[in-house]
Every structure is written in structure tokens, then in C-alpha cells.
């Protein structure tokens, strides 16, 4: 595979408009989903409540399970079958009940167990797992998750500004922000429940995306130091991406294979993490090639390093002329 992508000369940067259109369309679909169906589907860890994973001896009727809970005063509980037809999860998120549980009153889990024993008989239901989170803890976890992503972005910007240049840092952070937004859109569109493991996946992708962008930008910096007479910044970006392409292909293929194994073989609890990681790895690869480079090109054109304004305008004119020349060459080739 390394030899296949050796000494390639693909023109990546010129496809930035197509890449921007695709990503904006996907992010817009996510915003529409937010507007139509409401906010993110948070897990018990963020909303507060009780989650119980149950196993019945014989497959029950979901309507009977719900009627048993309603009779016990547990209104609005979410009942979901997963895996075998005897395995169910019950999520109780009623605010008054959660507050009562947080205050030390009888736990909702006990009420659920008693209600099901009364309906189906004692010993017919086995409790596999129980999670209970108070409303205050859930709010603190939501705030902490948001702060973690914000702090990660800030430190990435600071590191790149010191290591490279603030223009590189800004391009990398904007590219990483793109990855976060498009991953959130994916989570919303496909109704993935946001738990602590999903937040961990998003934070992992922040570092993964930034790392891949840094590798390409490091090669750009090296190529800028070399004699590059007649080469525009877009040419240097294309050359740098092509030079790091074998490494990118091997790294991303390995990482995606690991997440794919999790997706296919892991259980229901870890599967949302695997979905987000698999999608995020693909998007991190895409953004490091088609988003970070064009963003750097735009930033360098908007705030050039050159002190002479006339020279800076000449550089931007040269970029435009190069784009026009490429288009003319393609027409001539036809």
C-alpha cells in the first residue's frame, strides 16, 4: 500500500469547494434535526435518573411491562429491547422521582423491581445492571464535558501557535472545530445516545484530528523553508499532503480497523463509542486533507506574513492565476 501512494501528485486543494459543500450540507442536516426533534439524546449520566438492564426468563410483552410500571407510579419510563428478546433496558427520568432518589428516599430501582415481581412473579426477572445518577451530578457532568472540549481546543491553539505560527494554529483549531460539529451532527442524525463514553470518543477525536493536521503542517513548514521558486502556497500544500499520504493511509486504516472490530464485536454499551470513533476517524482524515489546508491558504491570503502590502497582493494574485491556469490546462487537455 505504501508503494501505491508513493510519489503521488494529486491536487487536493482545488477540491475545497466540493469538500466545503459536502460538510456544510451534513452539518446543516444536523441543525435541522436539532430544530425538528429537539436537543441531544443524553444518557442517564447527564440527565439524572435510573437505568436498569433486565433479563426475563421468558420474552415479555412490552405493553405489560409498561402497564406494570405505570401502575407503580413510574410514568414516562423508556423501555427498550436489545440483544435477545428477553433482554430489556428501562430508563426512568422523571424529575420528581430523580429528586426523591437524590434526597435518599426509596430508589426508583426498588420500585421497578417490586412492580415487575408483582406483575410477572418473583424470580422471573434478573437485574443485570443498575445505574443511578442524581440531577445535580448530571448537570455537573454536562458542564465538565463541555469545558473539557473547550480547554482541549484552547491548548491545541496555544501549542500550534508556539510550535508553528498562529496562522497554522488557527487553521488547525478551525479544522478540529469542523470535526466536532460534523460528529455532533452525525450523533444527532442517527440518534446516538450521548454518554460519558461518547464524550470520551469526541475528546479522542479532537486529539486525533489535531495530530494528523500537525503532521501535514509540519511538512508544509519544512517545504516552505526549502527553495520553492515559482511554487505557490497551494502547490506546497498539495505536495506536503502527497508526501504524508502513505503515512496517513496506513495510520487511518489501522485505527479504523480497530474501531470496526469494536463496532462489530463489542456489546451494546460500548457500541455508541465505536460508532462515533469510526465516523470521526474518517472525518479526521477528510478534514486534515480537504479542510485544514484550504483554511490555511485562506488565512495566509487574508493575513499574509509579508510586510509589503503590494507584494502580498501579488502573492494572492499569483494564487488566482495558478487556479485559472489549471482550469485552462484541463480544458486544453479535453
Swiss-Prot record:
Q: Name one GO biological process term.
A: intracellular protein transmembrane transport
**Main localization (coarse):** membrane
Q: Where are the transmembrane segments?
A: 18-38, 144-164, 168-190, 195-217, 258-278, 279-299
A Pfam family the protein falls into:
Sec_GG
Signal peptide positions on this chain: none
Listed GO MF terms: protein-transporting ATPase activity
State the oligomer form and interacting partners: Forms a complex with SecD. Part of the essential Sec protein translocation apparatus which comprises SecA, SecYEG and auxiliary proteins SecDF. Other proteins may also be involved.
UniProt-recorded name of the protein: Protein translocase subunit SecF
**Origin organism of this chain?**
Gemmatimonas aurantiaca (strain DSM 14586 / JCM 11422 / NBRC 100505 / T-27)
Give the organism's phylogenetic lineage: Bacteria, Pseudomonadati, Gemmatimonadota, Gemmatimonadia, Gemmatimonadales
Q: Please name the gene that encodes this protein.
A: secF
Amino acid at each position: 500500500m505504501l508503494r501505491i501512494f508513493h510519489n503521488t501528485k494529486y491536487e487536493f486543494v482545488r477540491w475545497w469547494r466540493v469538500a466545503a459543500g459536502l460538510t456544510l450540507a451534513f452539518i446543516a442536516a444536523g441543525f435541522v434535526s436539532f430544530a425538528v426533534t429537539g436537543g441531544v439524546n443524553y444518557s442517564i449520566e447527564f440527565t439524572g435518573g435510573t437505568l436498569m438492564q433486565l433479563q426475563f426468563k421468558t420474552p415479555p410483552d412490552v405493553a405489560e411491562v409498561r402497564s406494570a410500571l405505570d401502575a407503580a407510579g413510574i410514568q414516562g419510563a423508556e423501555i427498550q429491547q436489545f440483544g435477545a428478546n428477553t433482554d430489556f433496558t428501562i430508563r426512568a427520568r422523571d424529575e420528581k422521582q430523580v429528586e426523591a432518589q437524590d434526597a435518599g428516599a426509596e430508589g426508583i430501582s426498588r420500585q421497578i423491581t417490586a412492580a415487575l415481581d408483582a406483575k410477572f412473579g418473583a424470580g422471573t426477572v434478573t437485574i443485570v445492571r443498575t445505574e443511578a445518577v442524581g440531577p445535580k451530578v448530571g448537570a455537573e457532568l454536562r458542564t465538565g464535558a463541555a469545558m473539557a472540549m473547550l480547554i482541549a481546543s484552547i491548548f491545541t491553539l496555544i501549542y500550534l501557535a508556539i510550535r508553528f505560527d498562529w496562522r497554522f494554529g488557527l487553521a488547525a483549531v478551525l479544522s478540529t472545530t469542523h470535526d466536532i460539529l460534523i460528529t455532533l451532527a452525525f450523533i444527532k442524525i442517527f440518534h446516538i445516545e450521548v454518554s460519558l463514553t461518547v464524550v470520551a470518543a469526541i475528546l479522542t477525536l479532537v486529539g486525533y484530528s489535531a495530530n494528523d493536521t500537525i503532521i501535514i503542517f509540519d511538512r508544509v513548514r519544512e517545504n516552505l523553508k526549502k527553495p520553492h521558486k515559482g511554487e505557490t502556497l497551494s502547490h506546497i500544500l498539495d505536495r506536503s499532503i502527497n508526501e504524508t499520504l502513505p503515512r496517513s493511509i496506513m495510520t487511518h486504516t489501522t485505527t479504523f480497523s480497530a474501531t470496526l472490530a469494536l463496532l462489530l464485536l463489542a456489546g451494546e454499551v460500548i457500541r455508541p463509542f465505536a460508532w462515533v470513533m469510526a465516523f470521526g476517524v474518517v472525518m479526521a482524515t477528510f478534514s486534515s486533507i480537504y479542510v485544514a489546508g484550504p483554511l490555511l491558504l485562506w488565512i495566509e491570503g487574508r493575513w499574509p506574513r509579508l510586510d509589503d502590502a503590494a507584494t502580498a497582493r501579488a502573492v494572492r494574485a499569483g494564487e488566482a492565476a495558478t487556479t485559472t491556469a489549471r482550469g485552462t490546462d484541463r480544458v486544453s487537455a479535453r
